[in-house]
């Protein structure tokens, strides 16, 4: 049988052994194939990946891609595919009112594989952005339509991973709510047997108190923010409760954004052995192609590489870990035979690059992870002429 695509001479990252393996990758249709079962290694298309690292298609676990339904969202295929990202999780752009529109108009037709968190706010983030007429969402639990949220979740469990809440001072401080948005969201999630994803930047609670409400596989989003209550205590130590939470399976996602990353918090935590479980962008129209504070998942990955995080751990945080949380283990985030032929071919380049955090603090780096080609569902969707 003849291959459709053969990627030869590339190095594959062994996440368990922290080593590189010389391995050819074969594609037939939309699947990666076991080359031991192929008699003839001839292929319709051959990509010479010499000097490159062949990775599973990258997974951006936190972004906003309800393109056309919210003012802040990006077109996933345009922004993701040239940057090696073939799967994405939308972090609560839609609520129960507009989720079906999101699914029909964006999720279904997109090449990028998209799963989502359902916002507890009825209309999701549709009020954000749009200039002076935009406004923050109303997180008053009195307005949660629990029946409709449950109905939407139960009808779409193949796509919806859990409930999303933005729990920050600018949204809820001083509001006279009869009940707390976080406690109401947690209660509803437990009742519906699902997880939560909580935006914690400038949270209404200290991190060591907030984290008590998180279970295994709940998402602590923007874990390295430096606004208000961070994961560091007054002595600059990562709270013991935060470390314990990671041990019991709470997922800490950096979800960078333009307003959610602080070098001091990140470096201090990493020096103490506390690393993010997931590396993601929080892509929006504001921060994707318009600023280098985020720009792309590869740019954020490169920042962690220059902060000293192992390349193999970085790759795990954008492949294996998010694939499991998306309930797509073995399908994406892997180059194993039978998996979806989602592939990113990257090169580690030695070049000077500057990274900047929310507060304008800069890091001068000397390494960059650069995308050379992307395959999605077995199709070459981006490729440089020369690597």
Regions found by a protein language model. Name each.
Residues 340-386:
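C-terminal cap of metal-dependent C-N hydrolases
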Residues 265-348:
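His/Asp/Glu-enriched, well-ordered alpha-helical/loop segment
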Residues 83-89, 93-94, 109-140, 164-167:
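Metal-cofactor-binding active-site regions of metalloenzymes
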Residues 1-55:
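Histidine-rich, glycine-flanked metal-binding segment
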Residues 131-180, 221-223, 229-230:
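Active-site gating/metal-coordination segments in enzymes
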Residues 167-290:
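Active-site core of metal-dependent hydrolases
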Residues 41, 49-109:
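Metal-associated gating/positioning segment near the N- to mid-region
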Residues 57-63, 88-90, 114-118, 161-165, ...:
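Hydrophobic faces of well-ordered beta-strands that scaffold small-molecule active sites
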């Amino acid at each position: 049988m003849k291959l459709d695509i053969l990627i030869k001479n590339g190095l594959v990252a062994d996440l368990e052994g922290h080593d590189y393996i010389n391995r050819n990758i074969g594609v037939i249709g939309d699947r990666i194939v076991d080359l031991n079962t192929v008699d003839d290694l001839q292929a319709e298309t051959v990509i010479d990946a010499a000097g490159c690292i062949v990775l599973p298609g990258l997974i951006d676990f936190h972004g906003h891609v309800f393109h056309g339904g919210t003012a802040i969202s990006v077109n996933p295929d345009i922004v993701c595919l040239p940057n090696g990202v073939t799967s994405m999780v939308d972090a609560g752009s839609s609520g129960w009112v507009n989720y079906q529109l999101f699914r029909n108009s964006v999720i279904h037709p997109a090449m990028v594989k998209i799963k989502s968190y359902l916002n507890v706010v009825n209309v999701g983030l549709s009020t954000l952005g749009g200039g002076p007429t935009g406004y923050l969402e109303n997180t008053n639990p009195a307005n949660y339509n629990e029946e409709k949220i449950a109905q939407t979740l139960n009808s779409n469990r193949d796509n919806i991973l859990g409930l999303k809440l933005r729990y920050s001072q600018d949204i809820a401080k001083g509001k006279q709510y009869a009940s707390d948005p976080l406690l109401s969201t947690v209660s509803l999630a437990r009742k519906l047997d699902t997880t939560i994803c909580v935006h914690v930047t400038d949270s209404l609670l200290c991190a060591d108190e907030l984290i008590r409400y998180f279970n295994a596989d709940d998402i602590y989003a923007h874990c390295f923010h430096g606004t208000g209550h961070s994961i560091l205590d007054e002595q600059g130590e990562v709270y013991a409760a935060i470390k314990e939470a990671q041990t019991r399976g709470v997922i800490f996602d950096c979800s960078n954004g333009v307003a959610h990353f602080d070098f001091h918090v990140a470096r201090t935590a990493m020096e103490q052995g506390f690393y993010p479980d997931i590396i993601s962008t929080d892509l929006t129209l504001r921060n994707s192609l318009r600023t280098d504070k985020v720009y792309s998942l590869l740019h954020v990955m490169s920042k962690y590489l220059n902060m000293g995080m192992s390349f193999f751990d970085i790759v795990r945080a954008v492949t294996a870990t998010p694939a499991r949380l998306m309930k797509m283990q073995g399908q994406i985030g892997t180059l194993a035979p039978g998996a979806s032929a989602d592939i990113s071919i990257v090169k580690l380049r030695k070049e000077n690059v500057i990274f900047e955090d929310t507060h304008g603090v800069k890091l001068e780096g000397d390494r960059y992870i650069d995308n050379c080609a992307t395959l999605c569902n077995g199709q070459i969707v981006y490729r440089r002429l020369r690597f």
